[in-house]
């Protein structure tokens, strides 16, 4: 109700100025401004993410060591295995590294936890690797807390490259580690999904085979009335400074190294002659590189920048130097310098989009860039063949991935049949792909019934759901461990507090639990101090898993209860992006709002508030008639999922209503109809 509504209060003058400078709709500018995106550059980065904005994979700690170790294994013919988590983040990660190794002529043995095997790497799996003669294991979306198991593997002569994104413990495994969450990580974005980390490793490996690997490029430009230079190595910009005119000769003679490759951006003949006199291995003009890699015929630097900026989605805003544009064009060209490498990255990035959304990672920063690009690739008819088979001709969006594709493909792992999902992603037989989609779809229908039935059972058997305890837990041997997290998440959303759901003992007599928080409450921070009570514990602040001996269940739950305390703080505020006159709603407005996609965690669909609404009619619909629909004005539907009763009560009063809602277009018979999706209702003042 209104007590929990919070409408964003923006500076109207600044919003108008931002909209005018960026050439965007004022409503979109207002939403962005309210979410802290308030400069032309940040608006451009958000609405038009560029491939060159992705951080270099070599900024990740351990990346050079990982590349060197894998290349040594490939050169010497070592047997390599990939070990992944069994969810979609893990399986998409496995798919990328498996395909990479296949293309590098070294097919890998793949392994992941199977039904009732428990959580993560085990000694039994290590023994399996040893017996197969494997000497290098690459973990994807897991491994950062498998300290004892990796230590055991090292004693068996097996090395590990751990690519993971889960929270590390204070002790780390004896392996090459690639994880943006490491305490000493210098990587600019810590919220990559597991598949994002795997993608970075694949990119680094592909880069290492290019002639540009470990070469320092020096971009020198004459722009804005002066000279500028930038050092770039492996996509990392290390120095970006101006030069006084008088110091250009000194710079060329004293700072340039004999191994440097120089790229000139709009420089005159005098600078070219100075640089050429050094006898460097490479000196080229930026526009000539563009002609080579983009198959263009530019005759000058200015013509090159003018032609490539829109192609690369680069925009010049106040405060952006011409030199900075030249550097960004160079980074784009370097990424595209190999058709084979760029083609593989385009092939892999839809997998990153699906895995990142499926793991509910923040849709901001680099994640947003990769998701945007991955969805664009799928909508162009390219990318993973199985994903294209699922989507067909329908437009792919973050919503279709999170509501349809990810739940479907997560089903086999949740039901203890991970092999089906792995085969779906790895097979190259399109007929087999179609068979698998049919099997997985049937399994998904079964999964929905089981989850609904289990939730009803828990509600019936549990009295503690409505108590003021800081969290709720439930254990049942019949619950499939793969469904525990999904059930916990649904119940947490319902009762608005953290939930733990535990399944029966695995092959080693361990209880396996999945914990889900509510809102932004850091549940893991209250459980992590109790780590000695668990066989395994790991994950994220709001979603984590664990195992412990079955006989310890009461002791463990009591300890968590003491740590969490009573009634942990929660935020029920509904944050509204903008007030909107409902008469302004049409399908064109909703289409313009799609610029804000992809949506997800930390970039939720915008919420609007319309006041003093007169409801024309009310109708129930759905199998159980538990959904409601208002007709507002002449043609706008306002639907409320599972809100039939409350909508009836409000409409039958005859009073005007204030409604908080999302907007969507409903397609019917090839026409778009605007629709409000109700979040909350109250009487108008």
Give a label for each model feature.
Residues 578-640:
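Accessory interdomain/linker segments of ATP-dependent helicases and helicase-like nucleic-acid enzymes
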Residues 552-558, 646, 653-685:
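OB-fold single-stranded nucleic acid-binding module
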Residues 225, 618-624, 641-643, 664-674:
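Single-stranded nucleic-acid-binding OB-fold domains
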Residues 635-651:
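Beta-strand/loop nucleic-acid-binding surfaces
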Residues 2, 12, 18-136, 156, ...:
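Hydrophobic helix-and-loop "lid/oligomerization" segment in the mid-to-C-terminal part
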Residues 239-296, 319-330:
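Conserved DEDDh/DEDDy metal-dependent 3′-5′ exonuclease domain
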Residues 176-182, 280-308:
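Short alpha-helix plus adjacent loop in nuclease-associated cores
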Residues 194-198, 204, 275, 303-345, ...:
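Acidic, Mg2+-coordinating catalytic module of metal-dependent nucleases/exonucleases
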């Amino acid at each position: 109700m209104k007590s929990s509504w919070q409408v964003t209060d923006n500076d109207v003058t600044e919003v108008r100025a931002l909209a005018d400078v960026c050439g965007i709709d004022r409503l979109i500018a207002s939403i962005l401004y309210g979410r802290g995106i308030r400069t032309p550059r940040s608006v451009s980065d958000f609405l038009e993410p560029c491939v060159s904005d992705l951080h270099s994979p070599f900024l990740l700690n351990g990346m050079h060591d990982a590349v060197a170790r894998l290349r040594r294994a490939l050169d010497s013919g070592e047997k390599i295995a990939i070990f992944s988590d069994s969810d979609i983040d893990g399986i998409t990660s496995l798919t990328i590294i498996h395909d990479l190794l296949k293309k590098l002529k070294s097919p890998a043995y793949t392994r992941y936890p199977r039904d009732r095997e428990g959580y993560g790497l085990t000694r039994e799996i290590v023994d399996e690797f040893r017996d197969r003669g494997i000497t290098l294991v690459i973990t994807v979306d897991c491994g950062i807390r498998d300290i004892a198991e990796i230590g055991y593997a090292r004693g068996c002569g097996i090395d590990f490259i751990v690519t993971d994104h889960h929270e590390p413990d204070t002790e780390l495994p004896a392996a090459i580690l690639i994880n943006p969450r490491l305490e000493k990580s210098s990587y600019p974005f810590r919220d990559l999904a597991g598949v994002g980390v795997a993608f970075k490793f694949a990119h680094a490996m592909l880069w290492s085979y290019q002639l540009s690997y470990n070469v320092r490029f020096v971009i020198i430009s004459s722009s804005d009335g002066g000279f500028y230079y930038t050092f770039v190595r492996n996509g990392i910009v290390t120095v970006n400074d101006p030069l006084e005119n008088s110091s250009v000769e000194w710079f060329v003679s004293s700072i340039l190294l004999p191994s440097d490759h120089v790229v000139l951006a709009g420089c005159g003949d005098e600078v070219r002659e100075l640089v050429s006199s050094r006898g460097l291995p490479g000196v080229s003009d930026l526009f000539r590189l563009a002609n080579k890699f983009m198959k263009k015929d530019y005759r000058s630097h200015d013509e090159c920048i003018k032609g490539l900026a829109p192609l690369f989605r680069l925009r010049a805003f106040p405060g952006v130097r011409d030199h900075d544009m030249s550097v960004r064009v160079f980074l784009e060209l370097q990424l595209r310098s190999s058709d084979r490498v760029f083609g593989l990255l385009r092939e892999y990035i839809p997998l990153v989009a699906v895995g990142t959304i499926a793991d509910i990672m923040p849709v901001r920063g680099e994640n947003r860039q990769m998701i945007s690009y991955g969805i664009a690739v799928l909508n162009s008819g390219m990318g993973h063949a199985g994903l294209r088979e699922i989507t067909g001709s329908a437009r792919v969006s973050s919503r279709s991935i999170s509501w349809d594709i990810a739940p479907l493909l997560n089903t086999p792992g949740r039901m203890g049949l991970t092999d089906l999902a792995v085969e779906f992603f790895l097979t190259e037989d399109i007929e087999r792909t179609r068979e698998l989609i049919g099997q997985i779809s049937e399994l998904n229908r079964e999964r929905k019934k089981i989850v609904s039935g289990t939730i009803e059972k828990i509600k019936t058997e549990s009295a503690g759901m409505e108590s003021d305890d800081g969290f709720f837990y439930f254990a049942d041997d019949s619950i499939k461990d793969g469904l525990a997290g999904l059930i916990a998440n649904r119940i947490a959303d319902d009762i608005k507090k953290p939930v733990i759901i535990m399944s029966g003992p695995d092959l080693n007599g361990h209880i396996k639990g999945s914990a889900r928080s509510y809102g932004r409450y850091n549940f893991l921070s209250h459980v992590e101090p109790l780590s000695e009570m668990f066989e395994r514990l790991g994950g994220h602040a709001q979603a984590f898993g664990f195992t412990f001996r079955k006989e310890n269940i009461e002791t463990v739950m009591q300890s968590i209860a003491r740590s969490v305390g009573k009634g942990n703080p929660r935020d029920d505020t509904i944050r509204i992006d903008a007030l909107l006159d409902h008469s302004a709603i049409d399908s064109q407005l909703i289409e313009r709002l799609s610029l804000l996609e992809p949506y997800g965690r930390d970039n939720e669909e915008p919420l609007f508030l319309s006041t003093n609404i007169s409801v024309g009619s009310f109708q129930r619909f759905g199998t159980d008639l538990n959904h409601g629909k208002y007709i507002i004005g002449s043609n706008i539907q306002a639907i409320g999922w599972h809100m039939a009763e409350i909508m009836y009560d409000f409409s039958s009063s005859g009073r005007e209503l204030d409604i908080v809602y999302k907007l969507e277009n409903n397609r019917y018979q090839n026409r778009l109809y605007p629709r409000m999706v109700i979040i909350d209702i109250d009487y108008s003042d």
